[in-house]
Amino acid sequence: MPDRAQRIKGNSRQRTDAHSQLRAALLTAVRELAEQAGGYESVTMRQIAAQVGYAAPVVYEYFPGKRQLLLAVTDVGFAELADRLAEAGCPKRNPRRAEANPLMAVADALWTFATANPCLYQLMHTLVDVPFGTGDTPASALRCFELLKSAVTAAAPDHPAKAQDDDAPTDLFWAQLHGVITLALHGRIKGGHARARSLLDHAATTFRDH
């Protein structure tokens, strides 16, 4: 394992770039290890360091503890999901679904992301003490909500839940999608992934038609 003096060399800009690259590599490493292990609980800082070819103390230079590391992973996960939702809602990139029913487009994006990254998706929605629905909500998670809200508003502008508040229709639709996806990921729904996927399209259609 390289020692501290060997790790980062070069001028200031090169060192900054190297630090950013190593941080990204650590986040990628923990995600890969978690998917292999079936969850984040058993992944250790030592394993993460070994995955990128460093000693464990290097990880602590970037993240004081495992929780801080998982918070960073969660933030990256929501940022990636937001990009997927943005692409799904863009008529130029996804003309058939985005124009016919934007809710189908975002449901498809959410399903694809969750099933490709099951452990990450579950971490994003189960890590404790991550604020949602408050002024302290992470920007990446808030962007996901706003993109989903844009699709809900476009597809169902007069949804009856809006009588409660402007965010209520979005919360309800997200809850439907998340519920079906979570049941599918845990093997708790009849018919497995195939039936769960069709239920998402059904939810998107019925929610629009309310």
What do these predicted regions represent?
Residues 1-21, 92, 96:
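N-terminal intrinsically disordered/low-complexity leader segments
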Residues 21, 25-32, 51, 68-88, ...:
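Alpha-helical structural segments
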Residues 25, 36-68, 72:
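Helix-turn-helix
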Residues 33-40, 126-137, 192:
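Short, flexible, glycine-rich and Lys/Arg-enriched loop motifs at helix boundaries
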Residues 86-120, 142-145, 162-163, 170-173:
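Hydrophobic alpha-helical connector segments
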Residues 97, 125, 132-158, 167-172, ...:
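Amphipathic alpha-helical packing segments from all-alpha helical-bundle domains
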Residues 115-132, 182-190:
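Amphipathic alpha-helical segments used for helix-helix packing
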Residues 154, 174-192, 206-210:
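Amphipathic C-terminal alpha-helical segment
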